Amino acid sequence: MESVALYSFQATESDELAFNKGDTLKILNMEDDQNWYKAELRGVEGFIPKNYIRVKPHPWYSGRISRQLAEEILMKRNHLGAFLIRESESSPGEFSVSVNNRAQRGPCLGPKSHSRLG
């Protein structure tokens, strides 16, 4: 999972990771400490304060959108296998995956596949 640094941080301990505002850090572990995450920046690993970063959402997660909007988004991505995960409209608390499963035909994409996860 990626995050972006909201502020610069200067490490004061050998196991901490220094970074600058705007850096993109790879989060390796979010579970060991409630205030610190283990992260990587340019091949170096260390702990970072979680309140200094903003976790980037996964590009494939679209949250609460309709099936129709999911299809529109997939048409814009315009490639076979493009997918997204969204909250299920028909089964609250579950998720659906929408996949472009056909190659482009003329001006629009072929059928989409929608499956409920759960």
From Swiss-Prot:
Family the entry assigns: Belongs to the GRB2/sem-5/DRK family.
Keyword annotations: SH2 domain, SH3 domain
GO molecular function: receptor tyrosine kinase binding; signaling adaptor activity
Database matches in InterPro entries: GRAP_N_SH3 (IPR035645), Grb2-like (IPR043539), SH2 (IPR000980), SH2_dom_sf (IPR036860), SH3-like_dom_sf (IPR036028), SH3_domain (IPR001452)
Family annotation (PANTHER family): PROTEIN ENHANCER OF SEVENLESS 2B
Gene Ontology BP terms: cell migration; enzyme-linked receptor protein signaling pathway
Gene that produces this protein: GRAPL
Superkingdom field: Eukaryota
Gene Ontology CC: one annotated term: cytoplasm
Region (Disordered) residue spans: 89-118
Residue spans crossing the bilayer: none
Comp. bias intervals (Polar residues): 90-103
Protein name: GRB2-related adapter protein-like
Organism: Homo sapiens (Human)
Domain SH3: 1-58
SUPFAM superfamilies xrefs: SH3-domain
Native organism taxonomy: Eukaryota, Metazoa, Chordata, Craniata, Vertebrata
